[in-house]
Regions:
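Interdomain hinge/linker elements that couple catalytic modules in large macromolecular machines
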Residues: 3-4, 164-337, 341-354
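Hydrophobic anchor at the beta1->P-loop junction of P-loop NTPases
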Residues: 31
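A cross-kingdom feature that marks ATP-driven nucleic-acid transaction machinery
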Residues: 2-6, 11, 20-21, 27, ...
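Short regulatory helix/loop adjacent to the ATP-binding pocket of P-loop NTPases
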Residues: 115, 132-148, 160-165
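Conserved lysine of the Walker
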Residues: 39
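Short glycine-rich substrate-engagement loop in P-loop NTPases that contacts/grips substrate
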Residues: 61-94
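Conserved P-loop NTPase "ATPase switch" module shared by AAA+ and STAND
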Residues: 91-108
Length: 453
């Protein structure tokens, strides 16, 4: 485990602890997530703290002498003895955990979970990226004894924790619940702090680099390396390069403000079949590197019921990586660009950057992404609701504004159509807390609290 990651408190730790207490050996835990989000680190930290002993099998480095053990699981006593001798660790019944790290690299280990869980002597935690990609599961039986949770990049609160700030979000929760204004000066300070989070992002390695160096150029280098890693993965999955092309087009496609991601334009092929496109998007989704917002054709409580698989938008799972992707036209992004972004003085329309940050907050809170578009045929005007949340037996439309807004026509027209379905309306913007009739206007640094409310 990388020692420098120990400082980072992650919310998923409590989810893993809940699994351990409630499962009591009846299921294995599978932690999915994009590469470099910190899966291995948090799992090893959990194993050290919550068990007497543990064995970590990193399938990206172990040799065939370990992998071949999974070819025959008929003699578990031999299997466990071999592991203990190899790793020089004594396993304690019901007080040890075996970790399968990067389990997608050894599909038979994942398949073995069924017999291992049934045996019941130890707990099992699997971590993986690209774990649902077709080539990683085509030759095995997926065990039903797995409980899955997803690990995302660090959210804003986790980012503040990494900076040593354990009070701000608790105080902001109180402010949010009371709907009291902070005042312009304090709001500006909070916005600058949130923009710092957007620029650095939530990838642990990038956060660490910022803490150590306070140098945006070095942070950008870390993020570029992560992006290159993802692009290499996509080229391995899809040798035609189309998957990498779709990934690289995310910032430009969001900037176009189109009704949905124009996949055929991006891959420069209008003849490609719809099932091929669906397969590509599915692979991209399974990578956990992007967040997909699907168009909801009938915005009501069961948003998934009217999800349009052919109409969607793509967001980066990490807004910090999104920033680097946006300025990837040079070998590096100058500190001056980061400094102007931080002070909100860059002469560019970056509304989609804030939109990506809100999408990330929604996903981190455990929600799926949905949006809605509609047309006024009389005046030939298109309207769009950026995001829709389902709460209780109602829905909550959300519009994201990157600057001081004066109008909110889309959310008003949406209310005219679906007022009986709406619980609350939100505008997420860069200004202080306010209310416009029944519309809740919330600063973007409180966007995660909108999801929790």
């Amino acid at each position: 485990m990388k020692e420098w990651f120990k400082m980072f408190k992650r919310k998923i730790y409590n989810e893993i602890k809940k699994w351990k207490e409630e499962s009591n050996g009846r299921t294995a835990l599978l932690i999915e997530g994009a590469r470099r989000v910190g899966k291995s680190t948090i799992v090893e930290s959990f194993a050290k703290n919550e068990y007497a002993t543990y064995i970590l099998i990193d399938f990206s480095v172990v040799g065939n002498d370990i992998k071949i053990l999974f070819d025959d699981m008929s003699n578990l006593n031999y299997f466990f003895t071999s592991l203990q001798l190899y790793f020089r660790v004594e396993l304690k019944e019901r007080n040890s955990v075996i970790i399968f790290d990067e389990v997608q690299l050894c599909p038979k280990a994942r398949q073995a979970i069924k017999s291992l869980v049934k045996d019941g002597r130890y707990d099992y935690i699997e971590t993986g990226s690209l774990i649902s990609i077709k080539k990683n599961v085509k030759d095995i039986l997926i065990p039903s004894e797995e409980q899955k949770i997803q690990m995302n990049p660090m959210d804003y609160e986790e980012f503040l924790w990494a900076l040593g700030d354990f009070s701000t979000m608790n105080l902001l929760r109180t402010v949010f619940e009371s709907r009291k204004r902070l005042g312009d000066d304090l709001n500006r300070k909070m916005m600058q702090q949130f923009r710092l989070y957007m620029l650095v992002g939530g990838m642990p390695q990038a956060v660490y680099e910022y803490i150590q160096t306070n140098n945006f150029k070095k942070v950008d280098e870390v993020k570029r390396n992560i992006i290159s890693l993802y692009e290499d993965d996509f080229r391995k999955i899809d040798s035609t390069g189309r998957l990498a092309m779709i990934f690289e087009a995310i910032p430009s496609q969001l900037n176009k403000k189109a009704k949905g991601f124009q996949t055929k334009k991006v891959i420069k092929s209008y003849k490609v079949k719809e099932d091929v496109i669906l397969s590509l998007i599915s692979e991209l989704k399974d990578s956990k590197v992007v967040n997909i917002a699907y168009h909801c054709n009938n915005p009501d409580v069961g948003l998934s019921a009217s999800k349009d698989l052919d109409l969607y938008k793509l967001y980066m799972a990490d807004t910090g990586l999104f920033v680097t992707m946006q300025f990837k036209d040079k070998d590096f992004t100058d500190n001056i660009i980061y400094e102007k972004l931080l002070s909100d003085k860059l002469s560019a329309n970056l509304g989609y950057l804030y939109e990506n940050a809100v999408a990330q907050a929604i996903v981190s809170s455990g929600n799926q992404l949905f949006y809605y578009t509609f047309t006024n045929d009389k005046i030939k005007k298109n309207y769009e609701i950026d995001f829709i949340l389902s709460k209780k037996n109602k829905i909550c439309p959300i519009e994201v504004k990157s600057s001081n807004y004066r109008k909110h026509i889309s959310i008003d027209k949406f209310y005219e159509k679906f007022s009986n379905r709406i619980l609350k309306r939100y505008i997420i913007h860069t200004k202080d807390i306010s209310k416009d009739k029944d519309i809740q206007c919330i600063p973007i640094y409180l966007s995660s609290l909108v999801c929790e409310e």
